[in-house]
């Protein structure tokens, strides 16, 4: 049984690191899409004339 003073399993550390990176990328994507600078984003499909 692990106690709080023992070292965590390396697999748990890797899983938590990957989870943190994915959450950070998701948060950054949402902030880019809906944040304060989203009003300056343009849609290339709307800008294209046929």
UniProtKB/Swiss-Prot annotation:
The chain crosses the membrane at residues 14-34. Belongs to the PsbN family. Pfam families: PsbN. The gene is psbN. It is found in: Cellular thylakoid membrane. May play a role in photosystem I and II biogenesis. InterPro entries: PSII_PsbN. This is Protein PsbN.
